Design a protein with these regions (language model features):
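Non-heme Fe(II)/2-oxoglutarate
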Residues: 1-87
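Short conserved micro-motifs at the rims of enzyme active sites and ligand-binding pockets
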Residues: 26, 188, 208-211
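Active-site region of the double-stranded beta-helix
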Residues: 64-97, 104-120, 127-131, 135
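Short beta-strand His + acidic residue motifs that chelate non-heme Fe in jelly-roll/DSBH
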Residues: 111-114, 183-190
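A short hydrophobic beta-strand segment most commonly corresponding to one strand
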Residues: 122-125, 176, 191-207
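Beta-rich strand-turn-strand
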Residues: 170-181, 191
């Protein structure tokens, strides 16, 4: 009898925290407003349309109003790496990047496939999303598997042969994933605001950390 044993699996951490949405949106509203102000000239050149113009904030991880949320995400990220089997007793997790962004109401918002180099964890927390919003897409991180991939029986099913997957998060969904996974966002059409926080975390050796 044939038995399947799974090795080299890729974990994705998912948690629903809808109680975070309203308080975090309240903190993030001014950041998005400021980002849209910076985009005014681009929108003006497009005759008032924000098609393809993403409102992208400056770093927000140090905002005191977000402290408890940032700490929670940092703790879960450490636990995520620990559960993967990494020895982190001499490491601490540090946010290298954290920002909020909102895709344009007129559509065209997207992210091409990419990774964030020199990080160990990437993640998202969704603040506004409806059924027509862009979809987050993750790609198979195994280059050798992609090089010799055979045709899939069905692109509709998630199988061992899948080269990419997507999901439909809700406002309040927290995603934590290994930073080596290539990810993207599909092109969105005209829709209600699609807003999320994107963050990247590096596990740094404690001996390199500045003592307080």
């Amino acid at each position: 009898m044939m038995q399947f044993k799974e090795y080299f699996k890729t974990p994705i951490y998912v948690e629903d925290l809808p109680q975070w949405v309203d308080p975090i949106n309240k903190v993030c509203d001014p950041y998005i407003k400021e980002a849209k102000e910076r985009n005014k000239e681009k929108i003006k050149k497009q005759k008032g349309s924000d098609f393809g113009v993403v409102a992208h904030s400056f770093p927000i991880a140090s905002d005191p109003k977000l402290k408890k949320y940032i700490k929670y995400i940092g703790d879960r990220s450490w636990e995520f790496l620990d559960c993967m089997g990494y020895d982190l007793k001499n490491h601490t997790c540090v946010f290298t990047e954290c920002w909020v962004q909102e895709f344009p109401k007129d559509g065209g918002g997207h992210h091409n496939s990419h990774v964030h180099p020199n990080n160990h964890v990437s993640g998202f927390f969704y603040l506004h999303r409806n059924e027509d919003s862009p979809l987050p897409v993750l790609h198979d991180p195994r280059p050798a598997a992609l090089i010799c991939a055979l045709p899939e029986k069905s692109g509709k099913d998630v199988t061992y042969a899948s080269q990419a997957i997507h999901w439909r998060p809700n406002p309040g969904t927290l995603i934590i994933q290994p930073a080596y996974i290539t990810h993207q966002y599909s092109v969105g059409g005209p829709n209600k605001p699609f807003r999320f926080i994107h963050f990247n975390i590096q596990a740094i050796e404690k001996r390199f950390m500045r003592s307080q």
